[in-house]
């Protein structure tokens, strides 16, 4: 029902992680992760949520000092009481590497396509298959997976 925004961020200041409140922005340093307060608050909300959609990493996870937000968001999704949908190639890889795949409702390597599908937009690949089925008078039967 709500969109929760970060209250702080982590900037990369000469290679060091510096947490800043949103009110302290802008600064002349790149923002590389969520701040610690945001990580705690978002983790709590994710664990209590009915549905979680996580599309892409929370920060520059390739750098150890800036991977915390991404790792903690994934951990919270794995512990959520609700349904967790993960989208994006980086996210899918991290979920798999951390052995969390079986704790997620669905993991999609297509980040943008996943969001397009959720939004009800036409997916070009699916549309092409539907047109082909019509052209060759084939019936498409959806396959429903039981939990």
Ranges and model annotations:
Residues 1-147:
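Active-site loop-to-helix "anion-binding N-cap" substructures in soluble metabolic enzymes
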């Amino acid at each position: 029902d709500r969109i929760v925004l970060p209250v702080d961020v982590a900037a990369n200041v000469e290679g060091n992680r510096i947490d800043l409140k949103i009110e302290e922005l802008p600064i002349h340093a790149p923002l590389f992760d969520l701040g610690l307060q945001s990580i705690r608050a978002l983790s709590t909300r994710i664990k209590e949520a009915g549905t979680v959609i996580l599309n892409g990493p929370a920060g520059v996870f390739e750098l150890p000092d800036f991977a915390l937000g991404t790792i903690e968001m994934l951990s919270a999704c794995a512990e959520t009481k609700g349904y967790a949908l993960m989208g994006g190639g980086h996210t899918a890889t991290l979920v798999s590497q951390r052995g969390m795949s079986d704790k997620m409702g669905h993991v999609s390597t297509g980040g943008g396509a996943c969001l397009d599908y959720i939004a009800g937009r036409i997916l070009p690949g699916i549309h092409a298959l539907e047109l082909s089925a019509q052209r060759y008078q084939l019936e498409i039967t959806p396959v429903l997976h039981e939990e």
